[in-house]
Amino acid sequence: MEMFTYPLAAVILAAGLVTAAAPRLIPELHKLKFGQSIREEGPKSHQVKSGTPTMGGIMIILSIAITVLVICPLTLELGLALLIMLGHFALGFLDDYIKVVKKQNLGLKAKQKLLGQIIIALLTAYFAGLPTDLWVPFAGNIDLGYGFYALLLFVLVGTSNAVNLTDGLDGLASGTVIAASLAYMMICLWLGKLELAVFCAAMVGACLGFLKYNYHPAKIFMGDTGSLALGGALAAIGILTHTEVLMPFWAISSLKRARISMKLTNPCSESPRFSVG
């Protein structure tokens, strides 16, 4: 029963922290005019979202970090998961800050984000001491050598940006992360990695608490502060459970959901080339 008790406690605590923080944070973000910027070239149906508070990821990520540190001892794997998540949190926060405070709609340049993610990947590779083999279904373990580190960067960049692209549509990013985190929680329990299972459960709880305020009509968006960090956290779990091969499939399915949602909310659009954030 212990294997389910701690994850359940993490879901409840993280959801409670976000639910308690949201009624206080949303008015503050309104007061500071930290509103969502909608690109003029984007779908006209999304213009009504302009001004909706963003940077809600602050309460999501802090709730996850507090929850796992309260419930679990800080192991190397848990520390690495937190490092990757908080590194992407810092990147996302800076990106949102430039958008909403400096009023520059594009935020950080793509190459600046990539540089930040390369640094995070290098730190992960240095501290983790991960084996360089990749498990492939029906083929077993394949040693990639130094190619593994290129794969690690691809997983971090691809997964974090896949979540990032789903933000800005009511409930889509948080709902997507809940589904992926639940799946990874079960994988972690199956592998006997209880601390990582608690980490995934905290992600589920925090996103459930956030979904109450992000469901249509959204009162707040997580912004890059939350979406990049949650994507980075999922990538971290994939790397630490050595299931990196699953991440591209998850990223592709996330983008397909975003495409479908964009078409449903903007039927005249041929392609969701623009995110609303």
Indicate where each model-derived feature is located.
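Short aromatic-rich membrane-water interface segments that cap or initiate transmembrane helices
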Residues: 50-51, 138-147
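Juxtamembrane helix-capping/reentrant segments at transmembrane boundaries
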Residues: 38-52, 103-116
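Alpha-helical transmembrane segments
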Residues: 1-30, 60-90, 124, 145-277
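A cross-family signal for N-terminal binding/gating loops and helix N-caps
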Residues: 30-35, 47
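Glycine/proline-rich, flexible active-site/cofactor-binding loop segments
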Residues: 104-141, 179
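Hydrophobic alpha-helical hairpins/lids featuring a short glycine-rich hinge
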Residues: 74-109, 113-114
